[in-house]
Design a protein with these regions (language model features):
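Conserved alpha/beta enzyme-core scaffold
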Residues: 1-120
Length: 120
């Protein structure tokens, strides 16, 4: 096995965010990809009791690994054992009611009214 000597900016960002994940907190992983990887890594390594909600409203899934978050956001492998399958509107509603502690956002487009366009 070779030793990695260089890391991409994406990998550094994921590891940095993973270190910030706190036990017992709820995270909104919006945008898939890097935010979801970071939350899963933080949950696995540092904060096993951290929970997360995906941008499409799936609450506390236990994904079957391996899976590719960008391609399987609502696939059965990604939302295994979820507490609830909601919608993007329900995820936003939970956040507005204060049921989420932090949001981890990916690169996306936000218009002047605060609407998020995270399509790909």
């Amino acid at each position: 096995m070779t030793r990695a000597e260089a890391f991409s900016e994406r990998e550094v960002a994921m590891c940095t965010v993973a270190h910030l994940i706190e036990d017992g907190r709820t995270y909104w992983a919006a945008g898939g990809g890097t935010p979801l990887y970071a939350v899963l890594l933080g949950q696995k390594l540092y904060a096993p009791d951290a929970q997360y909600v995906t941008e499409d409203g799936v609450i506390s899934p236990e994904p079957l690994l391996p899976f590719e978050p960008m391609m399987t956001m609502v696939a059965s492998r990604a939302v295994h054992h979820a507490l609830q399958w909601g919608t993007m509107n329900s995820a936003g509603g939970h956040a507005q009611l204060g049921h989420m502690d932090y949001g981890v956002l990916n690169t996306l487009q936000v218009d002047q009214h605060g609407n998020i366009n995270s399509t790909f």
